[in-house]
């Protein structure tokens, strides 16, 4: 059995054992179902990056197998996180806990896997400041970890953009902070979120107050995309059109929507083309 096959088995096992505990809760059950599907979608997007980006084309099949495994398992602790929230109403960092969990398993105790899993959802500065990363003496290993992390982060964003823009009505419950509130108040973009976006920055979670804030923060992930293939793929899937429709549904002012889309298009043009 290959490493990737073992990873798929582990992912399915973690999903099934935690799903059994939360299955009586519609919200937690729905969230968990979305996350197992998401993991497979991220794996698919990640495979595209690994096949098409120049950096990975020169790497060995063994290295690519490890990279594919890290990407597939990026959310390995999500199912435990949802179960813990259901049982104890406690929050955990699924990236940090996922890395700890995998480091205890012989097959997956590899910095090429555990560090990308740990930091796939963090602000990138947190990764660079992690002693486990910056204390590595082998510069080639550090570069390999960084590129796998970049692939995992990009694939995660692409998959989230896809499911949110294509299945918005079904995803409102698990994505928006106030999914039942369709008033104009939820279409307001608060100042901290707006200013961060205008500066071309990833929006801090602590800034998010409204549904519109949430959508703008998700779209602002574009400022953290690393590979041109990721942008090419997203553009082929018409994610920007999907975001425009969602922002309109949330009753965001059209002038602000136009500004948002123009900023994103201008950034993509200058950064990747």
Descriptions of predicted regions:
Residues 1-28, 35-41:
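Conserved N-terminal diphosphate/IPP-binding helix and adjacent helical/loop segment
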Residues 2, 30-36, 40-61, 73, ...:
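Divalent metal-dependent phosphate-bond-processing catalytic cores, especially two-metal-ion Mg2+/Mn2+ enzymes
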Residues 105-107:
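Long, charge-dense
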Residues 110-113, 124-128, 161-162:
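Short, structured loop/turn "capping" segments at alpha-beta junctions
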């Amino acid at each position: 059995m290959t490493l990737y096959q073992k990873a798929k088995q582990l992912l399915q096992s973690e999903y099934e054992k935690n799903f059994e505990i939360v299955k009586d809760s519609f919200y937690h059950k729905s969230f968990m179902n979305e996350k197992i599907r998401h993991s497979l979608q991220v794996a698919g997007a990640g495979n595209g990056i690994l096949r098409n980006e120049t950096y990975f084309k020169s790497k060995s099949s063994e290295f690519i197998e490890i990279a594919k495994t890290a990407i597939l398992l990026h959310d390995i602790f999500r199912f435990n996180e949802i179960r813990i929230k259901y049982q104890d109403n406690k929050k955990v960092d699924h990236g940090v806990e996922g890395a700890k969990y995998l480091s205890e398993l012989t097959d997956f105790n590899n910095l090429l896997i555990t560090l990308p899993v740990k930091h796939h959802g963090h602000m990138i500065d947190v990764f660079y400041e992690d002693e486990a990363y910056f204390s590595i003496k082998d510069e080639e290993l550090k570069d390999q970890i960084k590129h796998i992390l970049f692939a995992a982060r990009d694939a995660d964003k692409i998959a989230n953009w896809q499911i949110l823009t294509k299945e918005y009505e079904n995803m409102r419950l698990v994505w928006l902070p106030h999914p039942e509130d369709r008033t104009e108040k939820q279409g307001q973009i608060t100042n901290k979120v707006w200013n961060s976006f205008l500066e071309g920055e990833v929006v801090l979670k602590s800034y998010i107050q409204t549904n519109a804030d949430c959508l703008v923060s998700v779209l602002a992930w574009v400022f953290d995309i690393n590979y041109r293939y990721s942008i090419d793929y997203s553009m082929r899937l018409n994610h920007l059109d999907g975001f425009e429709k969602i922002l309109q549904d949330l009753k965001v002012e059209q002038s602000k929507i136009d500004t948002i889309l123009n900023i994103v298009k201008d950034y993509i043009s200058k950064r990747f083309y």
